Amino acid sequence: MRSSAASDVYKRQYQNTVVREKMKEKTKESVSAVVPIMLIVLLLGFTIAPLSPSILVEFIVGAVLVIIGMVFFSLGAELSMTPMGERVGGSMLRTKKLWMIVAIGFILGVIITISEPDLQVLAGQVAAVPNMVLILSVAVGVGVFLVAALLRILFGIPLAPLLLVFYAIVFALAMFVPKGFLAVAFDSGGVTTGPMTVPFIMALGVGISSIRNDKHAGNDSFGLVSLCSIGPILAVLILGMVYSTAVSYTHLRAHE
């Protein structure tokens, strides 16, 4: 009993140490990402683009809140999404059921994309398409191509030919889509580089490739994000063929 209790105490101490170290790491990353932009804006605010004191105060407070939010968001994503992705990927492959890998991969791709903050921002800037229609279209695109990426790892298919084929389809569709949709389509591909999507997708690939024992398994675990980024582009291009009206980004004013 004493050894078990001591073991539990040691585990908790180790976990607390890991969390503290990760917290320091994420704090440094967030500060280094936000502070340079903050300094540039303040420099412009005191020189060529004067801002009122109230706006400057709001900006500084907002920047501090952004840093705090990024710390906890990235910490939570790394401590939860990455381990979960690896375990889910390994468990999916152990089932040895192709239909289950396809179904789970698609559902996970859709859900993780809907939760992506970048997608919510993008959807709010497209005036001609309802927010939920755009969000679901992009999510389905990511889900379909996440399945394709997982099957590529599973069967050891080379990445380069797939990228050539899919991007050829993208550029072919681009010729039949209204110009207003082109910018939206290619911007939507950036959704797969968000802080929620990237850790989970990469961890999922690592989990699946870890079950394979061949020499190419490690290399095949990469390339998931590059394939998944094609999904939103194709989805929005197809959406553009349905919505033939012009799309315009709403111009958000800095201050009402």
Predicted regions mapped to residue ranges:
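Single conserved hydrophobic/aromatic residue that forms the stacking wall/gate
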Residues: M1-Q13, H251-A254
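Juxtamembrane and boundary regions of transmembrane helices in multi-pass small-molecule transporters
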Residues: S7, L150-L164, G180, V184, ...
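Cytosolic juxtamembrane amphipathic/interface segments immediately preceding
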Residues: N16-K26, V88
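Hydrophobic core segments of alpha-helical transmembrane domains in multi-pass membrane transport
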Residues: V35-T47, G62-F72, I104-V110, V142-R152, ...
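Short, hydrophobic transmembrane alpha-helix segments
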Residues: F46-L56
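Structural signature of hydrophobic alpha-helical transmembrane segments
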Residues: V64-I68, P130-V140, T192-F200
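Flexible loop linkers connecting adjacent transmembrane helices
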Residues: E78-K96, V121-Q125
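Helix-loop-helix junctions within the multi-pass membrane cores of secondary transporters/permeases
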Residues: L98-I169
